[in-house]
Amino acid sequence: MMRPVLFAAIILLTLTTTAPALVYVEKKGVLFYFPENETEIAAALTEKMPEFISFLAQKGLAINHPLHVILDDKLDEPQVKVHVIPHREIRIPLRAPGVLEDGYTRENPWAYFLFKGLCLQGIYGIRSGIPGVLHKGFGDIVSPNVIIPPWVDDGICGLLYAKYRGIEIQDPLEAAVFHASPPPDLDIISHHPQIWPGYHGYRIYGKPFIHWLNREYGWSKILEFLQLHGRGIVPFEIDLKAIKVFGKTGAALWSDFQKAYTREIPAGQGLLITGYWGEPFVYWNRAGVYPGKIQVRQRGRYGYVEPDGTLWVSQYDQMARLYKYSKGTVVSMDFKPVWDPGPGRVAVTRLGHRPYLIIFADDARGGFRHARRSDRDHALLIAAPAGVIQLPGPVRDGQGRIAVAANTAGNWDIWVYDDQWHRLTKTPSIEMDPWWEGDSLVYASNLSGKFQIHAADQNQLTQSAYGAILPRHGKYLNLTGRGWKLQNYKLGQVAFAGLAYPMDARIEAPAGHSPMETKPYTPFKSLWPNYIRPDLFAAATDLQIGIATKSRDVTGNYIFDAGIRYSFDTNFLALGAAIQVRRIGARYTRYPLSYTTALDQTVDEARNEVKLFWRPIEEKTISIEDLLRAADGLELGEGLELSVNWRTWKPLEGEGSYRDEGWAALSFVKHWGILGGWGNLEIFTENRQSLSLGINLLFGDQIISVMDLMAGRAWGEPTLGHTTFRIGGNIGEGYFTRNPSRLFP
């Protein structure tokens, strides 16, 4: 009797855990969550949201409810995240985009991300026919339009935003790359992000393609295609739907688009560069670091290289952090958020949405080895000027002065900090990429209509045909039709003009908003899932069918899953349910276990298990919004877990009474770069113990190989299927046990 009472008490205790520091407002089926100290941004978004929804509805993109919108303090990646399960969700990064990142020219980038998220929700919500019928039974997991190429849905949302605002569809650099060469083949855009123009080719060419499609065929045809795709039972198939709507396949439409923008194919070959360092020459992009490791990551534009070639660069792993690339190894620093490391140990961080420069303690090599949480008290923080929402690419000279680009309502200028802030430029153009030249500065600007390198007095130093950016060590990136070429901006330059700051560096304060009536955060508004997933396992020995669902609240601190599965071979109905609140959780499972070893040892048991666990150390290895993509949302990703377990079992067939046993377990999972390890110690009653360990090694560049080693041992009297180590078995095992399917039933 005590065990069920204890189980219920722990569940109640976990459900009353203190909620995150979030508040929310609810209007007409839209729940908007945000940090309680970010009401200014939230108020502006809630004011604009009805207008956005109305505009999209007029275009045929109705927004389904309920809808959860999150202004996410733990998201730095410069793009909106949109999901339809376990609830309809739009996740907006609280960090404003850096220069050349999506949305960087928008007066209010959070409003731009909100519009884009609403647009995608409108596209994903279009379904009819067989998907419409299945949607009534299984929920939002039936959403064919989720499977649309990014150059289509990004292009559609870009077109609608441009129509709504009455602006150009592309930002200045996207337009420059687009006009530098003819559009490449569709295969390059869809499948080869390592080839020029790179990963963001879907943005560079998708927006003009949809704009051309709208001009040639009209918006009604684009909407008709979305509606037809939303009723298709083979969502990957596009060409037949395109023929029915446009009279041509998707490839033929792209070919017509290419013909409409025919240009001379440029000679020579450039490089695919996101960022670089001039001395020694090192460059990087999304695919990897050169020279160095080929590893796909979303890297920032700015970095710092030590004389021995050690590179410091920022990467977006949900939140931004610094990485050290040195001699084939990659090490991440645990201080976050931080991005854009530059010379002089300076980088950028934020408190809420407001950016700060941060100067880390000296590591004697000019690097960022003190970018650790344990050294945070030794770092110096410098707040951005009032009204500035982003400070990308800081560089610090020998005198301690820091030059940086700054974004004010979508306008970018160069600022200098020398114990106080000075605004060096004040133009409606985009100024970025500052670099010290002695006592003076150079930077990139599109003041002339194209990006060129300019001196501090705005004197233009380059005459690039398409664009010049990122001055470093006398070099700059010159845009060509086939990539970036490294050239010299110092040719013929004797000296650079000195710094002269305009007298007025004030920024007009943005208009205030009406006070908001908010409610304290509750997880139950978003915890209940909006879908049921059909489940099927078929093998020569068994057929199993069932349904399952998983969910989480918008913070990821509350996780729930449940499911049932029927086995025709064993005539057994398995079921499981679990909940986790922050670091504490509980699970119940009912499942069969039936196998025969090579030694003709047989286990046939019907089991019930209860597990209570606590994770004093847990590192999220996947982002909150991608939690459902893991094998199990409650699985220990990395860290330490202590658990208390209780099991009852009886023979799977025939008569027999229930027996029970209890045990305590200690589990760990840890990764050190390419090496990972795990272990599980179980201490049973009646003086029985069981230990299993494993390591895995990942190696290779473009093709990754994995080597796994496992070992195990049991002490005391071994109990078959309980404390014994076993390799082999049916991959269907472990569905509800959450133990590895080939290790330890």
Report residues per predicted region.
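Beta/coil-rich, acidic/histidine-enriched accessory regions frequently appended to metallopeptidases
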Residues: 24-26, 51, 224-321, 328-331, ...
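C-terminal outer-membrane beta-barrel translocator/porin domains of Gram-negative envelope proteins
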Residues: 588-603, 611-616, 623-745
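A short beta-strand motif characteristic of beta-propeller blades
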Residues: 267-268, 293-297, 329-337, 379-387, ...
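A flexible loop/linker signature enriched in serine peptidases of the S9 family
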Residues: 170, 286-289, 298-300, 312-323, ...
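Acidic/His/Gly-enriched intrinsically disordered linker/tail segments
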Residues: 85-89, 94, 102-109, 113, ...
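Extracellular/periplasmic ectodomains of large secreted or surface enzymes and adhesion receptors
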Residues: 255-279, 285, 334, 352, ...
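Juxtacatalytic substrate-recognition/specificity segment
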Residues: 21-143
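Outer-membrane beta-barrel initiation region
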Residues: 259, 267-270, 490-590, 612, ...
